Amino acid sequence: MAGMIGSIGMLLQNFIVPLVVILVGNMLRKHPVSDMRSHNGYNTPVSRRSQAHWDYAQKIAPEIFIRLGKYLLAGEAVLNVVLLLARVSVGWALGIGGGIGIAALIGGFYYTDLKIMAYMRGEDAS
């Protein structure tokens, strides 16, 4: 029993990435950055192409990252339960959960940049 409680405690580390993504999304939403030169806010090469790119990025990135974090949090919870019931070692479970978290984070940046580029081409009505 004590081993299982320790395993559950270790698996809580899989929630770090989703919680940080939600936190950063909330901070970006509450404190939008209008100055591109400040190097704050959603700051990628695509968002720095022009002031219009920057403004749109600051508008959409918070909502995308909050939504991504919520989905990732739910996914990590289900994954942890499945891996715990399957008796997968904690090391493997942390590796799998961390890998999924990092992949989702990279995907969030990629998706946001695609939305910015589509909007600037006039293909995105949102």
Regions found by a protein language model. Name each.
Residues 23-41, 111-115:
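Membrane-water interface of transmembrane alpha-helices
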Residues 88-126:
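Alpha-helical transmembrane segments and their immediate juxtamembrane interface regions
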Residues 42-46:
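A short, exposed loop/beta-hairpin motif centered on an aromatic-Gly-Thr core
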Residues 10-13, 34, 38-40, 65-67:
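A loop-to-helix transmembrane entry motif
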Residues 25-31, 48, 52, 83-90:
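Membrane-targeting and insertion segments and their boundary/processing signals
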Residues 14-25, 69-72, 76-80, 101-112:
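Helical transmembrane-bundle signal
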Residues 47-66:
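Membrane interfacial helix-start motif at the N-side
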Residues 1-17, 75-84, 88, 93-99:
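Long, highly hydrophobic alpha-helical transmembrane signal-anchor segments
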